[in-house]
Amino acid sequence: PKSATFRTADVVGLDTMCYVANTAYEKCPDDPEKDVFKLPDYINKMVSNKWLGQKSGQGFYKKVDKGIIHSLNLKTLEYEPMNKKRHAAFTLAKEKTYLRDRLNAIVRSDDVAGEFLWKTFSRTLIYSANLAVIIADDVYSIDRAMKWGFGWELGPFEVLDAIGLNYFVDRCKKDGVAVPSWLLDLKSKQISSIYAYLDGKKYFYNLEAKDYTELLYHEKHIDFQIYKSKNNIIDKHWSASLVDLEDGVAAIE
C-alpha cells in the first residue's frame, strides 16, 4: 500500500494490529513463521500509553504542527523530526516508470536499502510459496486476495515474477535460504515465470497439474498485458502507453 508499513499500522490502529497479531500467534501453532507475530516491547508500551495511531492522534507518527509530522524513535520512544535519507535503491526505483521494473531494480541494489528490501521481499515470497499449496487452490487466488483485500498493487507471485524467478531462486540459494521444491522444479524445467502471456491469453503455473493453465477472466475485465503481449501498442512514451483494445477502442495506461 502507498501508506507503507508504519503509516498503515497507524491508520488501522495499533490495538487492532495487536489483536490480529496475537490471534495469529495463538491460532497458528504450526505456522513456520509464527514468531513474526510476537509483539516487540515498544509496541506493547505504545499500546499501554494509548498511542494507537490515527484514532488517538499519535502512534508511529505524530502531527506536532500544521504540516509538520514527527516520527517515533523506537529506542527512546520520543518523537523526533523525520530525517529522510537518500539511498541508491530509491534513485534506481525513481528511474523506472512501472512497478515491476522498480521492484526488479531495487532488490539488485547493493546499498543498505536494497539489502533490506531484498530480505523483506525474499522472506515474504518464500513464505507465500511454501504455503501456496495449503492455503489456496492456485497462486492467482493468493495474489488476488492480497490485492483486493490488502491494497497491494501486485500480489506476491506477481512480485516474484517482477524480481525474476531465476534470479530469486539463485540468490535465495546463495543466501542459504531453503527454496520450495515447486520453484526449483520450475527452474529445472527452464520456466522463467509463474505467469505467462501466450497468443493473447494469460496463463498461470498450476501447482497440481505442474503446467500452465489459462487464467479465465470475466468478460468485462481488461488486462492491458494481454493486449500488449499481442503487440497492440499504438504509441509509447516514458510515462504512458496507448494500447489498442480492439473493437475500435484504444486506452491510455
Q: Which residues does each predicted region cover?
A:
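N-terminal glycine-rich phosphate-binding loop for ADP-containing cofactors
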Residues: 1-253
